[in-house]
From Swiss-Prot:
EC number in record: 2.4.2.10
Catalytic activity from the UniProt record: orotidine 5'-phosphate + diphosphate = orotate + 5-phospho-alpha-D-ribose 1-diphosphate
Subunit-structure text: Homodimer.
EC top class named in words: transferase
GO biological process, alphabetically ordered: 'de novo' pyrimidine nucleobase biosynthetic process; 'de novo' UMP biosynthetic process; pyrimidine ribonucleoside biosynthetic process
InterPro entries named among the record's database cross-references: OPRT, Or_phspho_trans_dom, PRibTrfase_dom, PRTase-like
Annotated positions binding 5-phospho-alpha-D-ribose 1-diphosphate: 26, 72-73, 99-100, 103, 105, 124-132
Annotated source species: Hahella chejuensis (strain KCTC 2396)
Biological role: Catalyzes the transfer of a ribosyl phosphate group from 5-phosphoribose 1-diphosphate to orotate, leading to the formation of orotidine monophosphate (OMP).
Protein name, per record: Orotate phosphoribosyltransferase
Keywords, comma-separated and alphabetical: Glycosyltransferase, Magnesium, Pyrimidine biosynthesis, Transferase
Pathway(s) per entry: Pyrimidine metabolism; UMP biosynthesis via de novo pathway; UMP from orotate: step 1/2
Length: 215
């Protein structure tokens, strides 16, 4: 586990973005942990999340020409990442995001920001069913650009109705990489290293054994 990953887990727990207990997911499964990126909702947390996304991006082999944030949660995330790359890496990276509905007046269309061209890296919080990512990939291709990959905060490493996770399906169907700041395996490693979380480690490990995908 990289230092930035450990720091991100600690930060997420501190901000109660990552919680442990019993939570019912949209799938109906009872999960021993819950991750709510919507709680990164202050200026300080937004600056911090931009730093963690940038750390994951620069540690990855992802190649890209610009950034794209799917509406709505991806919009502040891609903005925070773009600002962090400028401040910490002196990189001037174009970015854009989409509207849920096309605008008929003014500049019109569904895209806000830089024109979509070249290799486009999609930035979002998590991938659950993958519907939003598939829609964005269609938008990118329709504009003559190429989806270069997806950068998210957490990979739950959890299968859907079949044997693959939504992330694995995206990777297979579109032949693009999905990179996460952390995976569930890193959360387990963190919990195992701290006796305070021994009960949580056991519960999350059992959940991973039942619903997890092969890493």
């Amino acid at each position: 586990m990289h230092d930035y990953q450990k720091a991100f887990i600690e930060f997420a727990i501190q901000r109660e973005v990552l919680k442990f207990g019993q939570f019912t997911l949209k799938s109906g499964r009872s999960s021993p942990y819950f991750f709510n990126a919507g709680l990164f909702n202050t200026s300080t947390t937004l600056a911090q999340i931009g730093h963690f996304y940038a750390a994951a991006l620069t540690s990855s082999p992802l190649q890209y020409d610009m950034l794209f944030g799917p509406a709505y949660k991806g919009i502040p995330l891609v903005s925070a990442l773009a600002v962090t790359l400028a401040n910490e890496k002196s990189m001037d990276v174009p970015y854009a995001f989409n509207r849920k509905e096309a605008k008929a007046h003014g500049e019109g269309g569904v895209i806000v920001g830089a024109p979509l061209k070249g290799k486009v890296l999609i930035v979002d919080d998590v991938i659950t069913a993958g519907t939003a990512i598939r829609e964005v990939i269609s938008i990118i291709k329709a504009n003559g650009a190429e989806p270069a990959g997806v950068l998210i905060a957490l990979d739950r490493q959890e299968r859907g109705q079949h044997q693959l996770s939504a992330i694995q399906e995206i990777e297979q169907n579109y032949q693009i990489p999905v990179t996460a700041i952390i995976q569930l395996d890193q959360i387990l490693e963190f919990l195992k290293s701290d006796p305070h979380f021994s009960d949580n480690y056991k519960q999350v490990a059992e959940y991973r054994a039942v619903y997890g995908v092969q890493s």
